[in-house]
Amino acid sequence: MLEKLGHPEKDLRIIHIAGTNGKGSVSAFLRSVFECAGLKTGMFTSPHLVDFRERIQVQGDMISKADTTRLGNRLLSMDFGVYPTMFDYCLAMALLYFKEQQCDVVILETGLGGTYDSTNACGVPDVTVIAKIGFDHMAILGDTLAKIAAEKAGIVKHGTALVLESQEKEAMDVLKQAAERADIKTTKVVNWDEIKILPQKDGKQCFSYAGYDAVTMKMLGVHQYENAVAAMLAAELFFEKYFAGKKNVPELKALQHAIREGIDRTQWMGRMELVSNDPFFLMDGAHNSNGVEALKKSLETMYPDEKFHFIMGVMADKDYGEMIRELLPLALDFKTVTVESERALQGEALADCIRAKGIPAEAYQKLADVLPDFSKSSAEKTVAFGSLYFIGEIKAFLQGKQ
């Protein structure tokens, strides 16, 4: 496809991101940092929550409906000699659009795995980031961390600079071997022990890392410290390559300020998103056991000794039993909903599974019946999770209500 389109990716400076959890947050942090540094930034991400066009953004703005239609019709009219998937078409559209928009930097998030992901056809990126690796999509990627890590490591290519988030030893060994095979000259590993978590500042999380003191961020959740640091390291590596040999290179202080400012400004829909303080309603896209573990840690840290009403919608191919088990110590009860997807687990079956673990659960047909009444004050705390598709449905519903 790219060959028939004239290889638009060859005119782009790319940061390639893979990982089971956190890659969307790392992408969002990077986009914000680059925009603060004055670079025109394209971002390709998936899935979307409410609008398909969320997948293709420049400077934080979605591709227009007119450009989506124009580029979509162009792609659909071409004979590629193969049968592209929707994801293939979407990526091709993104690359054409980013080239037209003359982006200085493009952030590409893998859709699934790495080795055989469509984004891996885009040549050697300036920087490659591997976020947290855990168990998900095991029928496709493999049933051990080592197998899953090997798929993610398929995006590590000779000539790129590499950033790794901390990993289980089994996964890290595979990633380091891949870096060695590709003869990677620069590898930076996020060291969790070097992240100093500070008291919140003006309602924002705050931390220090290496030369950066008291960095603030709106993004909530304990796991976001590491995602933020991964983005900071990736940005430093990209700036080093991007400004090499250029005239009028910004001072180091200015770039460091852009990194701090970008981390502070970052917002990302559906990730530990506090929709309302009173009544308290938070939603998170945690959709596998590792994601729910991170959600649990964040809730315990941010709201110690609190119990929650959980709203859950999940896909049938997920390890929903383990996801439920993680949250049992924090749960008052569960409300379940069937997500609008062929892959969804029926809400009643999910409620049965929860009740079998000794926690009250009830299945509902309509979102309106499970969400808090936002017109009334309440001390109760409600958290929705289980699937990004489910969070997208809630966002669309709330926007309709507003």
Language-model features: where?
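Walker A (P-loop) phosphate-binding motif
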Residues: 1-49, 54, 127-129
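Beta-strand->loop->alpha-helix junctions that form or flank phosphate-binding loops
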Residues: 44-47, 165-166, 178-200, 217-222, ...
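ATP-dependent carboxylate-amine ligase catalytic core
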Residues: 7-10, 36-123, 139-141, 169-170
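C-terminal helical cap/extension that packs against the catalytic core
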Residues: 165-187, 203, 280-281, 289, ...
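Nucleotide phosphate-binding/pyrophosphate-handling subdomain across enzymes
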Residues: 11, 100-101, 105-110, 116-129, ...
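Extended acidic/charged loop-beta regions that coordinate divalent cations
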Residues: 47, 90-140, 172-214
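A glycine-rich beta-strand to alpha-helix segment
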Residues: 370-399
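Membrane-proximal helix-turn-helix segments that form the acceptor-binding/catalytic region
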Residues: 149-158
